[in-house]
A protein has these predicted regions:
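Juxtamembrane intracellular "pre-TM" segments in multi-pass secondary transporters
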Residues: 3-18, 207-235
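Glycine-rich segments within core transmembrane alpha-helices of 12-TM secondary carriers
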Residues: 147-172, 367-377
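C-terminal membrane-cytosol helix-exit motif in multi-pass small-molecule transporters
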Residues: 190-211, 410-415
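C-terminal transmembrane helical hairpin of 12-TM major facilitator-type secondary transporters
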Residues: 296-345
Length: 430
């Protein structure tokens, strides 16, 4: 059977070949990694990007916060749009427009123009593209398979990010001038993202039931229904803390440079492994644990507990150059547990049995609340480093420990709400 998007009419996952389903999961999983790479370049190439743009720690944080503010506004309507517009349309348009913005970014414009570019990234990559990833994975499998499939999806996300990141590292390492290196890197990313747009246009089919043609584009009642669904709000708050800790861990990059005088090459490689490479095993491992424990929430609780232990180790270890390797190992370990939690962070929505009719809306709500940390954490932590230097990192790590504990509390409340709802349904059935 043909893979071409328009060759079959409307289909379900049962109508697609195994190869086609996995091709689509790979496509959107790669895309979810690469489409956001230009925005989050600082997570790996912190120093080269700051030099190339000629800005401060606070400037980098402010750019990302600007993006995040737009993103937070766009997350909920992105989920609603994902319930009303074809995945194929959202995917290829999102990729194509992001590629255009990346080519503008590659010109290294003024900081004022960069704010415009990052606002554009927020509108395009979130409002248009964001809802496609979770929903296409969900459309390509049964409800019971979602936790394991989204775990594998994050593994593919990690693999794609690692491969692209290694190419980016080679570009930065080969070119002495930081500005020129960043420009070439961004042009490369723009081309790759454009190719993903073409593939989406050709191969994503029209899924049966992916949109409801009889309802209006925006329905406040669907938002209210999603909010009222037992466990959804607690799951959203839990995801807020999962993402807050996950993003906070990116500051292990300047931590290694500032406190241990680690060479930029080592820091970049460790950053790549922490951000992408570890996902090759962390995503599937998290999905495996969730299946074995029969609860994504329990798995995330375990990952939170492990992250607290590693963060505590950061605070008590001596800050000497000889400790670079042990610290690098701990950074990778921390990347594993936080990535694992992040990779299945949306799974409590299926655990809460959110119906498909409002799944996109619930995912949008999860994103609005869950990704709020991007609006403040980068400016906050970047400002701390500018003001306090090496002393800022203990403050950052203490904050992350507190956030992990609060996340555990939210997960416990999520499970309580789900159990209470299940008991009520069982009682009404009898």
């Amino acid at each position: 059977m043909s893979l071409l998007s328009k060759s079959k009419g409307e289909v379900t996952y049962k109508d697609l070949s195994g190869f086609h389903k996995w091709f689509l999961i790979v496509l959107v999983s790669m895309g979810s990694s690469i489409i956001y790479t230009p925005v989050y370049l600082k997570n790996v190439f912190y120093e080269p990007l700051m030099q190339g743009l000629g800005c401060t720690n606070a400037d980098l944080g402010a750019l990302l916060s600007c993006y995040a503010i737009v993103a937070v506004i766009a997350y909920l309507p992105s989920g609603i749009i994902a319930d009303k517009v074809r995945m194929r349309t959202l995917s290829w348009v999102g990729f194509g427009a992001t590629a255009v913005l990346t080519f503008i970014y590659a010109m290294l414009p003024s900081i004022q123009m960069l704010y415009v570019v990052f606002v554009g990234y927020g509108i395009i990559s979130i409002l248009i593209w964001w809802g496609t990833r979770f929903k296409i994975v969900r459309l390509c499998c049964s409800e019971s398979d979602y936790a394991s499939k989204i775990g594998v999806s994050y593994s593919i996300y990690g693999a794609a990010g690692l491969i692209v990141g290694l190419i980016n590292t080679a570009i930065i390492s080969a070119i002495a001038d930081a500005s020129q290196g960043i420009q070439i890197l961004l042009v490369f990313l723009g081309v790759v993202i454009a190719v993903l747009g073409v593939l989406s246009f050709i191969f994503i089919p029209d899924f049966k039931g992916e949109i409801d043609k009889n309802t209006k584009l925006f329905s406040l009642s669907e938002v209210v229904t999603a909010i009222k669904h037992p466990g959804v709000i607690w799951a959203c708050l839990a995801y807020f803390f999962v993402y807050l800790v996950y993003m906070g861990v990116t500051y292990t990059t300047p931590f290694m440079t500032t406190c241990f005088a680690a060479p930029v090459a080592i820091v970049s490689v460790v950053g790549l492994i922490r951000t992408y490479g570890i996902g090759l095993i962390a995503g599937p491992a998290a999905g495996f644990f969730a299946d074995k424990l029969k609860s994504p929430s329990k798995s995330i609780l375990i990952f939170f507990a492990a992250s607290v232990i590693v963060l505590a180790a950061f605070m008590i270890m001596p800050r000497e150059a000889s400790m670079v390797i042990p610290i690098a190992v701990l950074v990778v370990l921390l990347g594993f547990v936080t990535y694992g939690a992040f990779s299945i962070g949306s799974s409590p929505l299926t655990e809460a049995k959110v119906p498909m009719s409002i799944f996109g809306t619930a995912s949008g709500l999860l994103s609005v609340i869950g990704f709020l940390p991007d609006t403040f954490v980068h400016t906050w932590f970047g400002g701390l480093i500018d003001a306090q230097g090496a002393d800022a990192f203990n403050t950052i790590f203490v904050a992350l420990v507190v956030f992990a504990v609060l996340g555990c509390i939210c997960l416990v409340m999520t499970r309580r709400a789900m159990k209470k709802n299940a008991a009520a349904e069982a009682e009404s059935a009898n």
